[in-house]
Swiss-Prot record:
<comment type="function">
    <text>Activates expression of the shikimate transporter ShiA in the presence of shikimate. Binds to the shiA promoter region.</text>
</comment>
<comment type="similarity">
    <text>Belongs to the LysR transcriptional regulatory family.</text>
</comment>
<keyword id="KW-0238">DNA-binding</keyword>
<feature type="domain" description="HTH lysR-type">
    <location>
        <begin position="1"/>
        <end position="58"/>
    </location>
</feature>
<dbReference type="InterPro" id="IPR036388">
    <property type="entry name" value="WH-like_DNA-bd_sf"/>
</dbReference>
<dbReference type="GO" id="GO:0032993">
    <property type="term" value="C:protein-DNA complex"/>
</dbReference>
<keyword id="KW-0010">Activator</keyword>
<feature type="DNA-binding region" description="H-T-H motif">
    <location>
        <begin position="18"/>
        <end position="37"/>
    </location>
</feature>
<keyword id="KW-0804">Transcription</keyword>
<dbReference type="Pfam" id="PF03466">
    <property type="entry name" value="LysR_substrate"/>
</dbReference>
<dbReference type="GO" id="GO:0003677">
    <property type="term" value="F:DNA binding"/>
</dbReference>
<dbReference type="GO" id="GO:0003700">
    <property type="term" value="F:DNA-binding transcription factor activity"/>
</dbReference>
<dbReference type="InterPro" id="IPR000847">
    <property type="entry name" value="Tscrpt_reg_HTH_LysR"/>
</dbReference>
<dbReference type="InterPro" id="IPR036390">
    <property type="entry name" value="WH_DNA-bd_sf"/>
</dbReference>
<protein>
    <recommendedName>
        <fullName>HTH-type transcriptional regulator ShiR</fullName>
    </recommendedName>
</protein>
<dbReference type="InterPro" id="IPR005119">
    <property type="entry name" value="LysR_subst-bd"/>
</dbReference>
<dbReference type="Pfam" id="PF00126">
    <property type="entry name" value="HTH_1"/>
</dbReference>
Length: 295
């Protein structure tokens, strides 16, 4: 059994799609399929149920996944320890992020890591809203995640890295598009575009909190996992959305973003990781983040 077999298995298990897993690993799909077959042959168990439309983990695959992650993580720790003993930091660090909400933090962190840690490869994993990101941290599928705070989990360490005010994004032809400031109570009859409740996103929670401050419960016209797609839907007339000021600057041209009267709530951008002694490369990236972000 080879580490690369386990890495291939983990990629397919997380993507549930051979083509996507192959792209993630930077290899053709055919060798990846052969690698999985070798692993299944060595274990004497089928790890995936495959069809022309879907890939699913078998019971054996689900049981094997945490052990595979543990072996790969231990091997990474060992490699990094050997390199660290020679004064070199080498490794792969997987960073989760939600998308456009990280428009300023993720590019800056990535740039600084490239400058300061040239032998550390970053694997940037997008479209991870709060609840899924926490789950992936706990599973070891992510090393670090950028997310909204607070996070209520005793096993996860967090640090505040920035604060950002909210604004409202409206279609360009909205009746309030020409205002300087919007009182959210004037949007009580509008539909809101936001993230799904099951995602546990601070983006959604803040929408409800700000609307409650204005005295109403928002009517949700559409839910979508991607915060930037929410802005595109606003431009298409599906509804209005509450987002951060910086994200509003990136909104499509058929929308307007305006400050809101209710401003007691700010988005608390944070960085999160599992508590305890981590890998050398992961901890070095965390140190850089805490150095460059001063809330």
């Amino acid at each position: 059994m080879e580490i690369r077999w386990l890495e291939g298995f983990i990629a397919v298990a997380e993507e549930l799609h051979f083509s996507n897993a192959a792209i993630r690993l930077g290899m053709p799909q055919s060798p990846l399929s052969q690698l999985i077959r070798r692993l299944e042959s060595e274990l004497g168990q089928k790890l995936f149920d495959r069809s022309t439309r879907s890939v699913e983990l078998t019971a054996a695959g689900r049981a094997f996944l945490p052990h595979a992650r543990g072996i790969v993580a231990s091997a990474a720790v060992a490699r990094e320890a050997v390199n660290a003993a020679e004064g070199e930091i080498v490794g792969v660090v997987r960073i989760g992020f939600s998308g456009v909400l990280n428009y300023s933090t993720l590019p800056l962190l990535t740039s600084e890591v490239h400058k300061r840690l040239p032998n550390v490869e970053l694997e940037l994993v997008g479209q991870k809203l709060t609840r899924e990101a926490v789950s992936l941290l706990r599973l070891g599928a992510l090393d670090i995640t950028l997310m909204g705070l607070p996070i209520e989990d005793p096993e996860i360490e967090t640090r505040l890295i920035s604060l950002e005010e909210f604004c409202v994004v409206l279609p360009k032809d909205h009746r309030l598009a020409g205002e300087d400031v919007v009182d959210l109570v004037d949007l009580a009859e509008d539909g809101f575009v936001t993230t799904p409740e099951f995602a546990g996103s601070v983006f959604r929670n803040s929408t409800f909190q700000l609307c409650a401050e204005a005295g109403f419960v928002p009517r949700i016209s559409q839910q979508v996992n991607d915060p930037y797609m929410a802005l595109l839907l606003v431009g298409a007339g599906v509804g209005v959305a509450i987002t951060t000021h910086g994200t509003g600057l990136l909104a499509p041209p058929n929308t307007v973003h305006l400050p809101i009267k209710q401003h007691s709530v700010e988005l608390r951008h944070g960085i999160a990781w599992m508590k305890g002694s981590g890998r050398v490369a992961r901890d070095a990236v965390i140190d850089i983040a805490l150095d460059i972000f001063k809330p």
